Amino acid sequence: MRIDALKLQSFRNYDALDVAFAPDCNVIVGENAQGKTNLLEAIVYLSSARSPRARVEKELISFGKSECSIRADAFARSREFLLEISLAAGRRRKILINKVPAKKGGELSDVLGAVYFCPEDLLLIRDGAAARRKFMDDALCQLRARYAQALSDYHRAYEHKTRILRDSEEYPSLLDTLPEFDLRMAQSGAVLIYYRARFCERLGEYARIAHRECSGGREELGVTYQTVSTISDPLAPIETIYEQLRAHQSSHATAERASRMCLSGPHKDDIAVTIGGVNARQFSSQGQTRTAALAFKLAEREIYREITSRTPLLLLDDVLSELDPKRQEYVLNRISGGQVFITCCEEDRLGTLLSGKVFRIANGAVV
C-alpha cells in the first residue's frame, strides 16, 4: 500500500498543500514547528479517521478557518483509491472512498494501515497503563473492525455507568438502569479482552526478537497481558470471557455502589513488561525502556503484516534523532519493504543517511 499524492486545505498550519510522494522512502526535513508532524498526522488520520494528537477534531482545522479537507490518491489491494475527509465546524465529518460516503471512519483502515512512531512513544514502557492500552487500541482498531466497534460500545457504556454511580446518591432511582449497562460492558468488554490477549501474544513474540537484536542479545524482553483478575484464560472464547466478566460484575456490585466508581474492567487493562526478568517500568534505564518501546512499534508493523499480508505505512516522526547511533542504525536497517515517512530537523545528520525523496518544510509549505 502507498499514498501517491496528498492534498491539504486549511489543515493545521497548512493553508494549501499538494505533494506527490515516493513509493518507498520519503524524508521530510525542516526546523521545529514548521509542519512536519502535522503532515504525518494527516496521513495517520487518512488511515483510521483517528488523530494521534488532537483531542477534538476541530483542532485539525486551521486557526481562523471554519473547515478543512484532506485528500489522497492511494494504492492498496491491487487497485487505486481516492480518499477524502472533510471537517467543518458544527457539522458531521464527511468521509468519501472513491466518491462513495463511508458509514464509519474504520472503513479507511480497510484501505490504508499506518504505524506511527513519535518521541512520546519512547515513554511507552514508563508511562501509565493508559498509554499501553492506547497502543493496543490504535493497533487493533486498524486490524479488526469488530474490535473498533466493541471499543466504541464499551466506552459509551462505561461513561453511562460512571455517571449513574456518581449521581446515584442524589438520584437513587438511577441504579435501576445499572444492569443494562453492566450487560453492555460485559458484551463489548469480552471482545476487547479476546483480541487484546491475542495481540499481546504475537506482540511478545515479535518484540522479543526485535529487542534481542537491538540489544545485542544481552537482555530478554518479557510481555504479559494483564486484565480482570477473574478471567482465568484471556485466550478463551469470547463466550467464556463474557460469563466470567458477568460473574466479576456481580461480585463487585456492592463495592461499586458504595464507592460510586466503576472499579474494574478492560478499561484498566495493562501490558506488563520485563527486561531480564525485572519490572521494566520501575527498574530499567532510559536506554533499556527506549529499546523496548522501539521493539513494540516494530512488532506492531510485523503483526499488521502477518494478519493482513500487507505492509502498513511506517511514519517515524522525529524519533530517530532521539535514539543513539546504534539504535538509529538498527531502525534504518529494518524499515525496508513498504512506504516510509521520516521527519528530521535540518541540522540532523539523518538527512544524509537516508536515501529517498526529500521534502523541505517551512511555514506549512514545501519549499
Go through each PLM region and give its residues.
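Conserved NTPase motor "head" modules and their coupling/switch loops across ABC/AAA+ ATPases, GTPases
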Residues: 1-31, 172-313, 322-326, 330-333, ...
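Conserved lysine of the Walker
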Residues: 36
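Post-Walker A helix-loop "phosphate-sensing" segment adjacent to the P-loop in P-loop NTPases
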Residues: 45-57, 299-307
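Nucleotide-state sensing region of NTPase/ATPase domains
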Residues: 48-131, 137-147, 204-209, 241, ...
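Structural recognition of the conserved hydrophobic beta-strand(s) that form the central parallel beta-sheet
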Residues: 72, 339-346
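Long, charged N-terminal accessory/stalk domains
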Residues: 123-124, 130-179, 183-186
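Walker B catalytic acidic pair
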Residues: 317-319
